[in-house]
Amino acid sequence: MPLGRSSWICCAKYFVNTKSRFNEILPPRFTLIVSFYSMNTSENDPDGHYDFPEMTEHHSDRASSYANANNVNSTQPQLVSSEQALLAILGGGLQSITPNSVNQNAYSRSTYRTDGGLNSQPVSSLNNQWGNYNPAFLPSRYDSSFHPYTISQAANQPFPQHLLGNSNAGVAQQSGMRTIGLPPTVGSSFPQQKSSTYENFFDANSPSSQQFPSTYPSRSQNPLSSSGDGSTAIHAGPIQHQNSNAFSNYPYPLDASHLSSQQLLSMYRDQVSHGVTPSTFRNHESFMPTQLVSATELSKSVDNAVLPIPPTTAPAVVSPPASSFPLMSSAATSGNISSPALFDSELGARPEGSVAIEPSRVLLQWSSQSSSHTIPSAGASIPTSSLKSFFEHAAEAARKCNLDPRALESFEQHMLSDRLHDPVVLFHYFQIRNSICWLWIKNPTHAISRVEAQGVCVDRCLFQLASLAYEFLVRYGYINYGCLSFDSSFTNETNTGTTSSSASKQKTIAVVGAGLTGLICARQLTGLFSQYSSSFLSKNELPPKVIILEAKERTGGRIYSRALPVSHTSATQINHHTSNSNSISSNSTSLNPKDVTDPSHIPSAIDLGFQFLFSPMDDILLNLLNKQLGIEVTEMTGSDLVYDETDTKVLDMVEVKKLNILWEKLLEYVSVCFFINVEESVRISWISQFQLFIDEMFPDHLSKSLSLNASHEFSFKKTMLILIDEVSSYAKLGNSQKKFLIWCFKVAELDDTLYPLNTVDTDFSKDILIPKVARRGLSQLPWALQSYPSPLNIHYEKFVSKVTIENDKCTLDCKDNSSYEVDQVVIACSPSHFSSNIEFSPGLPNFVTENIKSIDFKPGKKVILRYAAAFWRKNIRSFGIIPKSLSQEMNNDENDGKSCFVLRIWNMLPETGVPILVADINPQMTSSSSNETSHLIQELHSLIVDHFQNDSNSSADLLDAWVTNWSRNGVYDGLNSYPNFANDKQQYEKRFRQSQLSYNLGRLHIAGDYIFSCVGCRTLQRSFLSGLSVCTGIIDSLAPISLTIPIIGETSRKELDQFLRNSKVNNFDPNAEAQRHLSYQARYRLKKQERLDEHKEEQEQLVTELLGYLPEPPSKPNANPFLLYQKMQWHVCRALADEDKRRLTGDSTAKATINETRAKLGKTWRQLDDLGKKPWIDEIAAQREAYAGKILRYQRLTKEYEMRAEQIRNDYAAKCQDEPIPDDEARLFMQAQREEEQRKQTQDDNISKSREASDEEYHDDGSSDSGYNGTRY
């Protein structure tokens, strides 16, 4: 029985009031009647539709979102579509067509997002046992106002700890994580009244007990911010951005008190049209975000109700990671550093009763980069600042990654020779490659995905170039190295259908040596195999496994830290142990390695091996320690006390500081003049600047100019000594001042810092030659490398004695009669160990053995003294001793053999909190009594007390003393390696490339700091880079690169040509650009314009922060009432057209076509009289009237906005005028003025010369005399 109009309205009213949910499709006529009912019902009518803001507690403070967006008068009757009415029936109010929310497209740039924690490091990015090393203070990869990857409204948020089990989560933490298993936009826009319903629902249905089994690994419980909350709020502030292309807000859901998360997800899918599939979501069946929480498995468990996480049952006996620092003995010890007694409590020592093989463990579930496998978007990774400044920062980041930002490396050119043949394409390749390096330097705690790398492109036609640069940077170890975790989203190829369970084969890579080179090699190989896992699965084999064979019971090699003892020992006990003990005393306090699992629990530690880091020689390690691992590295600041043995006095501290500045300038200048690839203009500029510096520092210099022609003919060290002689004679330096410079030369050579500072633009930082020390010891670096994100498979006490390579296998024989059969071998031990103790079959090539023989290792002897209290002056960084041998060497006298055996003694009190002095023994200046350890300690102690004791403090009680020697054993050759063939400048031009820091000999690979050790970085960083470089040959042999030739296809080539024409890059002339920058006037104008642009940008940002964004003009309404009638009556007319066609054809299943429906619409419209058309005409008139009101309001708001913005701009401009001009701009201004004066002077001189020349050419013959009276004939 058909229902009348009033019956349909009653039904609609019933469904609206009860908020019932429909699973079946409603009849179109019912939808139409609901629309009319919604139109004729007042907004504030309690029996009408449910408005979303009315469900909040303060429903009088906010107007209807629909009314604000579509109507000025809230009491005006509303015409809505059938879809809007259906959404109202399903439980939500009338939603705005253009919602006030963030853009939910996965890779649409959202520069207005206020969620500052989107790209910051999540809690779970570090192991839960390494809590105090969570670098939450680090800046995110993108600024707080720029977040390129906006995924729903909770992308890349850390997984809440309280959902995994019982925890003491606070109220803020509990309320911030109620969206697990719910649509993101629904969870982030809950009204307060309904939010409590969901909180009760989740309290009653704990996800930790139902959805997630107990075997899921726990996350870190450390707070993500200083507020103490265990989670980050989804929105840190109000969202002001309105995007018309954003995915619309979904309606408010039904009451969830009796619904499970799967039912909520099903309801969520029913409410969303299947025709719209944002790229944020995984597939057509699931509308859950790809990274709803940190772990990918969690989103799969919510989506599919299955948790495919393998059980994490721990093995019975597992060798612990190198997480414990051994306690230093309270007794003064001597003897060899590698003595067995000394290694009993070393770092990473294996506990008693454990087996030597460490089984592999399940990979920890670290948070991965959000949405790295979705569709890329051009410009998504570029910040909102100007491209010019961004490319400058990108070029600087490339230098920090050991890349020339404007040239291809030799191995890069070999790899890409067939693909980068066009200079214009090469120009864009450099910009893209440098920008990817900027992403890595900005935040190395997250691995860079291919999609994120493609986001640095300004146009999508450059995506192939980004893939090319990304492939090169990943394979050669310039990015994505260290303690990183990779999931399936980082695989470089598409999945071929092969899974790890169906694969049957697996290769093995063995790394011999667990020093820094071996550990970073194993960790990098593990990461590369994870990123290229699909390449192995496509061949029906598992990614290769990596094992490490270590000869000793600890890891770290020459990185060796020991915890300082707490107890104090008397002086009598010290003398007794010093004279009678050659090992650690049994009476000293010991620390069980099992009890210490976190280096942060160690109060203080001292390094017996590598200790100091210097910039820029160790920039890569410093970036890894500071930004990725969160290891605190402090600079050793303070003054230096220097004692001259010849003059028997302590030099003036002001004079020492002045000479230290001179030494730094000498090192910078020689670095510029030494490299043959430095442009002549840059060299001339540095010569003039250095000459000006010397003239200002030493006014009594000679009148002649400083000549440095010898720097082009000798090695770096020889050039430095020649420069010291010339500067000393030119500046009239005294004998003590020259000895100080030579002493600086000797100290730099001993500290392994005497290398040319190889930078392209000679941009020397102010903190060069300032030593940096890792608090709690440098052994935290190898401890982290072998422990995170999953422990490496290390086999201890495996002394390899023979390596046999036959056919496709490599056999490793150990001294304990054990044998390993692997596919490839990496030798990462010391050169003397594998050249003397390891037999190779077949033998090593001649060029390898010759290179090893050319390396000279310094012994690395070190003395450490611990006192009861500091007896020296405060704020003293080091104590220097200028020996008599320097004076004898300067005067060409014979050495009497009584010179001091130390050059510098470091004060470690500010870094360790314990009065400790560390001295490196100079192997070239040893006294006659230095062979005996006890005499060495007593002599050094007496020297310090006699020359550097403060008069106000007479107490100098020595508690402990340790002496280490890294050359008196068969495993280590010494501490630092030095080349014997370092006189060739061409060797320094290699810029310590990764590919030239290892040998790839088929299945045998050799890595270490002794390979091409003449490059410009210290031994420690060379060891690190060598371990990275050896992985390139391995991954290339196992997973070859797959790139198309040419790299840019025909279609992309056309798009690129059009893009280049639009951007006018074809007219780029590097020579003209270089000539333009040579002028100081042009450089000053650019610098000034850059400052003005920066002020303008800050000005606009200030206006935006204070006033928000400029109001958007209202959309113009439709002026044709028939179109409104057609939209609202489509379903009715289609039903009428269907009935007419069935009546004409006699077919009960006949359907009318679109044209027939349109004809029916036109016919019914024409049949309406004026009264029937009046509602539609009135609605159009009302919309026009509302539009007129909106226009007036928009004009008023715009005028007010512009007036206030102009006032803010004027105030900010007045403030900027009062600020002083930056020093670099003022310097350029002075140089530009001087250049202009010189130009004018030159111009005047040329004019004067031309006048003089014209006067000489002019001769007066009297013909122009006015008194001449000619006779006319």
Curated annotation (Swiss-Prot):
Its main location: nucleus. Residues 394-490 form the SWIRM domain. Pfam families: Amino_oxidase, SWIRM. InterPro entries: Amino_oxidase, FAD/NAD-bd_sf, Flavin_monoamine_oxidase, HMG_box_dom, HMG_box_dom_sf, Homeodomain-like_sf, SWIRM, WH-like_DNA-bd_sf. Its EC number is 1.-.-.-. SUPFAM superfamilies: FAD/NAD(P)-binding domain (SSF51905), HMG-box (SSF47095), Homeodomain-like (SSF46689). GO terms for cellular component: chromatin; cytosol; Lsd1/2 complex; mating-type region heterochromatin; nucleus; pericentric heterochromatin; subtelomeric heterochromatin. It is an enzyme of class 1 (oxidoreductase). Keywords: Chromatin regulator, Coiled coil, DNA-binding, FAD, Flavoprotein, Nucleus, Oxidoreductase, Repressor, Transcription, Transcription regulation. Residues 1115-1195 bind DNA. The keyword Oxidoreductase applies. Residues 542-1198 are annotated as: Demethylase activity. Residues 1233-1253 have a biased composition (Basic and acidic residues). The keyword Coiled coil applies. It is found in: Nucleus. GO terms for molecular function: DNA binding; histone H3K9me/H3K9me2 demethylase activity; oxidoreductase activity; promoter-specific chromatin binding. GO terms for biological process: chromatin remodeling; facultative heterochromatin formation; heterochromatin boundary formation; mating-type locus imprinting; pericentric heterochromatin formation; positive regulation of DNA-templated transcription; silent mating-type cassette heterochromatin formation; subtelomeric heterochromatin formation. Its cofactor is FAD. FAD binds at residues 509-551, 558, 572-573, 1147, 1156-1157. Residues 574-590 have a biased composition (Low complexity). PANTHER family: FLAVIN MONOAMINE OXIDASE, LYSINE-SPECIFIC HISTONE DEMETHYLASE 2. Catalytic component of the SWM histone demethylase complex that specifically demethylates H3K9me2, a specific tag for epigenetic transcriptional activation, thereby acting as a corepressor. Acts by oxidizing the substrate by FAD to generate the corresponding imine that is subsequently hydrolyzed. Has a role in regulating heterochromatin propagation and euchromatic transcription. Also has a gene activating role. This is Lysine-specific histone demethylase 2.
